């Protein structure tokens, strides 16, 4: 039965609501060489459980590039991707798609959920 009390019940779902460089604070804009912060829900990262975060973009030669990122930390509402060396030389205007594959829940067999968000380099 769906009722008003369930309208905002998002517990158990992965969500990426904003990605920004620590200094710019402009949502969905990252700056080369700056720390990248992610805000959302259920952003707990565990490499041991098989979680992954990747960044993909098209380089100047038209080739698709993808790199795996290792978050420095992740909690429920936030994740720190550090200063990814692979993204340090991207030119302004480049679109980067971040893909988060995280197991949400405490159980060992918690389901993997996927969230994507595209940002641009400022």
Give a label for each model feature.
Residues 1, 79-88:
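Short, proline-centered helix/strand-breaking motifs
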Residues 2-50, 108-122:
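Beta-strand/beta-sandwich contexts
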Residues 31, 74-76, 89-93:
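Surface-exposed coil/turn segments at beta-strand junctions on protein surfaces, enriched
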Residues 38, 79-83, 94-101:
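A structural motif
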Residues 43-64:
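Short, surface-exposed alpha-helix to beta-strand junction/turn motifs within ectodomains of secreted
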Residues 55, 89-107:
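Short, aromatic- and glycine-rich surface loops/edge beta-strands on solvent-exposed regions
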Residues 61-82:
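Solvent-exposed serine/threonine-rich low-complexity stretches and specific carbohydrate-binding patches
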Residues 68, 84-91, 101, 115-121:
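Terminal, compositionally biased low-complexity regions
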């Amino acid at each position: 039965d769906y009722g008003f009390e369930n309208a905002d019940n998002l517990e158990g779902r992965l969500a990426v609501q904003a990605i920004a460089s620590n200094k710019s604070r402009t949502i969905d804009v990252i700056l080369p060489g700056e720390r990248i912060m992610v805000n959302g829900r259920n952003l707990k990262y565990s490499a041991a459980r098989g979680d992954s975060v990747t960044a993909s973009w098209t380089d100047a030669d038209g080739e698709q590039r993808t790199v795996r990122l290792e978050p420095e930390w992740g909690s429920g509402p936030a994740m720190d991707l550090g200063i990814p060396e692979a993204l340090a030389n991207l030119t302004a205007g480049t679109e980067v798609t971040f893909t988060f594959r995280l197991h949400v829940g405490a159980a060992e067999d918690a389901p993997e959920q996927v969230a994507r968000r595209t940002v641009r380099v400022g």
